[in-house]
């Protein structure tokens, strides 16, 4: 059977392999270094998603507008829309898979402010979000 070749074992590569596996499509990852050495491990800030866990009435449409504006209106509008509207589901899926994230007292995902945003929209794992993301994706893959 043919296999899809994925170049790179960072977050994008592992995510692609997981998505293909969900569709029963075999894949093969070509990597220069193991996943724990990928650049994705270096990410510290967090993952932006309009989860509205901080009581600020956040929503994907506002996230979309702020992302498009932060990109000086040069980004592909459709890509920004897809990214911002799928972000809550992606973060919730990662959390359901066991990704360690900082939590509020009520057990919801804690979010903090980050550049270019008017709402607390960044889900994070202290200063090791990238490491937690890669660990989770490696377990699922």
For each feature predicted by the language model, list its residue ranges:
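N-terminal Rossmann-like FAD-binding beta1-loop-alpha1 element of flavoenzymes
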Residues: 4-28
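Conserved N-terminal/central alpha/beta ligand/cofactor-binding core
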Residues: 32-140
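A short, basic/flexible loop-to-alpha-helix module at the beginning of a structural domain
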Residues: 1
């Amino acid at each position: 059977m043919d296999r899809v070749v994925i170049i790179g074992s960072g977050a994008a590569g592992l995510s692609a392999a997981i998505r293909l596996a969900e569709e029963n499509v075999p894949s093969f990852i070509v990597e220069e270094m193991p996943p724990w050495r990928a650049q994705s491990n270096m990410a510290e800030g967090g993952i932006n998603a309009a989860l509205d866990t901080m009581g600020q009435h956040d929503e994907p449409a506002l996230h979309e507008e702020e992302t498009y504006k932060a990109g000086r209106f040069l980004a592909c509008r459709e890509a920004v829309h897809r990214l911002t509207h799928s972000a809550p589901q992606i973060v919730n899926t990662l959390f359901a898979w066991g990704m360690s994230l900082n939590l509020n007292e009520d057990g919801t995902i804690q979010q903090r402010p980050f550049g270019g945003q008017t709402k607390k929209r960044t889900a994070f794992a202290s200063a090791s979000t990238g490491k937690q993301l890669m660990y989770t994706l490696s377990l699922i893959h």
